Amino acid sequence: MEVKIEQSWKNALAGEFEKPYFASLVRFLHNEKASGKKIFPPGSQIFRAFDLTPLDQVKVVILGQDPYHGPGQAHGLSFSVPDNIPAPPSLKNIFKEIESDLGVRMSGYPNLEKWARQGVLLLNAVLTVRSGEAASHSKIGWEEFTDAVIRYVSDNCEGVVFMLWGNFARSKRDLIDRQRHYVLEAAHPSPLARGAFFGCRHFSRANDILSSIGRQPVDWQL
């Protein structure tokens, strides 16, 4: 199956695109559109995380659950929204933690493309959603695909820092070879977690790890 995705990922994931579950997933999305359902993000942005962070550049993975389901919010990067959209509550809490952890001022600019271009794979486990219906595209095949992505990174890259926030993301830890990679776990940054995310210091810890293995730290300031 021909999938429009960055070439290094296309090569790495070619086997997934030929599996029955992926054909079923594509059929489901076509049927959603044919029946007039509004799907986020727009089709050209579904694989945006991969387009901005080629496989050989991955040094951090931040795993989200599914895209924002409000108009104009989702643009293919976990936790991120486009420039003209107010930062959602979880992203505001991420920025607060960065300010506390790194002693920098965050502008509140909500588009995380700068991170993606530095090797931070902003991966949602589910890559599409129906407008206004959270988790409406869970269990249609995306989880199988993104589990394969995590497994591929684990098996074929070295020294990647995985940030797993909340129980859903943490459930993916067994896909990761912790002899080769670094797994940082914390509560979810959502306000529903009652502040348990604060103090995790994942951003300084990730940079310390990257520096210690000779990789360029991430400039987290926006």
Place the predicted regions along the sequence by residue.
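A polyanion-binding, active-site-adjacent surface
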Residues: 15-164, 168-171, 176-185, 189-194, ...
